């Protein structure tokens, strides 16, 4: 979306995705002022798709996914890695409104197991609206490397009238800030709160925050959960560190097939395999038995009214609903009347999200 950011003719933009069948109506209400946007980005919008480290190895294997960025997935990468911040055009948690808000952190405290914050939110604009308060933490960089910012909690206000104020309380467990030690740098296979200073940042996006009025100090490492190693990665040779360098990882192998969770299968034998052909005609061999064909409408030999008049109620249902999904592709098609020469036209579901394949035959939907 760098073209939106860089085009001086565009003063504002409204993004609507995953809206489903009511998404268009909701967008109309927002554009006409009947409603007020209050959504926040759940992703980081970088200037170019190549700015995301996952682009280089997206869908390179059907057997495993190599998260090159390791724990620095999404906004954690862009907020931590040197030089990555400049690539962001719309940060995680970002979202505007027709009105404005003021946030004031009035109190922060901790118990033995949790951290609490109270934030006063005031609508300082001219329109009724809602705001999302977000709290992030910065954990100390010790033996276990960590992202510069991590979302800890968030909450949305009620609909606030101009000048109205609401007190929001945010809380999260201290154990949520623990890091997993898989290599035994401190305690193998354990979740650990490393000693040091834990800082908190409160605001309306990962970038639009102010440091909290209180920090948390730990003088000793705290093990929050002790586990044992199972399903250790066998294909991960290295992983990214917070400075952009990589550390090599020890290699493990499945020494006994009975210890493996999955055994290798011949191609095509996996249960639930997506069909190679997504939409097939209901009749491979047929005679039209005097049925009027859709090609005659397309070529002007038959009116559309005459063509539709011959269809039964079942035919009309097939024409409207298309071919049912028989695999796991989660797409639908209109048409599916091969007896009348009407093919299936594949469409994406209304709230279809991002594709999980390297290539796709049907784009997803957004306004």
Segments (PLM) and residue ranges:
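Secreted, periplasmic, or luminal enzymes acting at the cell surface/secretory milieu
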Residues: 2-130, 162, 190-205, 209, ...
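Intrinsically disordered, low-complexity Pro/Gly/Ser/Thr-rich segments with frequent PxxP/GP/PP motifs
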Residues: 143-186
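Short, intrinsically disordered, charge-balanced linker/junction segments flanking boundaries
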Residues: 362-367
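Short acidic, flexible loop segments centered on an aromatic residue
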Residues: 126-143, 149
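Acidic, glycine-rich active-site loops and adjacent beta-strand->loop/helix elements
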Residues: 1, 47-49, 139-141, 174
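N-terminal amphipathic, basic-rich helices that act as targeting or association modules
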Residues: 288-341
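Solvent-exposed residues in well-ordered beta-strands and their adjoining turns
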Residues: 122-124, 138, 171-175
């Amino acid at each position: 979306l760098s073209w939106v950011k860089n085009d001086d003719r565009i003063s504002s933009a409204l993004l609507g995705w995953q809206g489903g069948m009511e998404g268009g109506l909701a967008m109309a209400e927002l554009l006409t002022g009947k409603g007020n946007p209050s959504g926040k980005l759940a992703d980081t919008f970088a200037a170019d798709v190549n700015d995301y480290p996952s682009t280089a190895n997206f869908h390179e294997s059907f057997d495993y996914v190599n998260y090159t960025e390791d724990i620095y997935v999404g906004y954690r990468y862009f907020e931590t890695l040197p030089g990555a911040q400049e690539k962001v055009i719309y940060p995680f948690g970002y979202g505007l409104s027709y009105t404005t808000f003021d946030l004031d952190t009035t109190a922060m405290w901790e118990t033995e197991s949790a951290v609490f914050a109270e934030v006063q939110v005031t609508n300082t604009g001219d329109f009724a609206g809602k705001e999302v308060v977000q709290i992030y933490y910065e954990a100390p960089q010790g033996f276990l490397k960590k992202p510069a910012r991590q979302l800890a909690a968030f909450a949305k206000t009620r609909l606030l009238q101009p000048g109205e104020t609401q007190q929001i309380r945010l809380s999260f467990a201290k154990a949520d800030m623990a890091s997993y030690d898989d290599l035994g740098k401190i305690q193998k296979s354990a979740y650990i709160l490393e000693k040091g200073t834990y800082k908190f940042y409160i605001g309306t996006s990962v970038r639009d925050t102010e440091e909290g009025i209180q920090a948390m100090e730990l003088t000793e490492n705290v093990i929050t959960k002790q586990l044992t190693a199972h399903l250790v990665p066998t294909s991960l040779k290295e992983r990214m560190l917070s400075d952009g360098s990589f550390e090599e990882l020890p290699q493990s192998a499945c020494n006994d097939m009975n210890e493996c969770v999955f055994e290798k299968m011949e191609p095509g034998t996996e249960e639930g395999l997506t069909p190679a052909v997504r939409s097939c005609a209901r009749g491979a061999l047929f005679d039209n038995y005097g049925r009027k064909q859709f090609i005659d409408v397309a070529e002007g030999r038959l009116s559309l009214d005459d063509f539709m008049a011959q269809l039964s109620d079942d035919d009309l249902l097939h024409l409207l609903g298309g071919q049912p999904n028989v695999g796991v592709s989660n797409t639908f098609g209109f048409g599916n009347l091969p007896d009348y020469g009407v093919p299936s036209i594949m469409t994406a579901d209304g709230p279809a999200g991002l594709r999980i394949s390297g290539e796709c035959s049907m784009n997803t939907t957004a306004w």
